[in-house]
Amino acid sequence: MKTLSEIKEILRKHKKILKEKYKVKSIAIFGSYAREEQKETSDIDILIDYYEPISLLKLIELENYLSDLLGIKVDLITKNSIHNPYVKKSIEEDLIYI
């Protein structure tokens, strides 16, 4: 099981690729990994914002890329997809930007 520090380092090293290939403007970790309460079975929750909208297929490709890169299942959401104010507040409380 990777630590939060290891995950942050991997994501930092790949920021350029994420920006160029997937148009990622910002990337942040939230949820159990951000709170350092993860278990062996935990996935990693990642929030992205992008420079220009990407297609659903590209979003799925990015989620798979990140899962392979980190060796952990990634649950990826976009900043613009959070419409419920309570969910948004809960996510914002955990966010760790890379």
Swiss-Prot record:
One of its GO terms (molecular function) is metal ion binding. A motif (GSX(10)DXD motif) lies at residues 31-45. Mg(2+) 2 binds at residues 43, 45. Keywords: ATP-binding, Magnesium, Metal-binding, Nucleotide-binding, Nucleotidyltransferase, Toxin-antitoxin system, Transferase. Binds 2 Mg(2+) ions. Disulfide bonds: none annotated. Mg(2+) 1 binds at residues 43, 45, 75. It is an enzyme of class 2 (transferase). Coiled coil: none annotated. InterPro entries: NT_sf, Polymerase_NTP_transf_dom, Type-VII_TA_antitoxin. It catalyses: L-tyrosyl-[protein] + ATP = O-(5'-adenylyl)-L-tyrosyl-[protein] + diphosphate; O-(5'-adenylyl)-L-tyrosyl-[protein] + ATP = O-[5'-(adenylyl-(5'->3')-adenylyl)]-L-tyrosyl-[protein] + diphosphate. Probably forms a complex with cognate toxin MJ1216. Probable antitoxin component of a putative type VII toxin-antitoxin (TA) system. Neutralizes cognate toxic MJ1216 by di-AMPylation. This is Putative protein adenylyltransferase MJ1217.
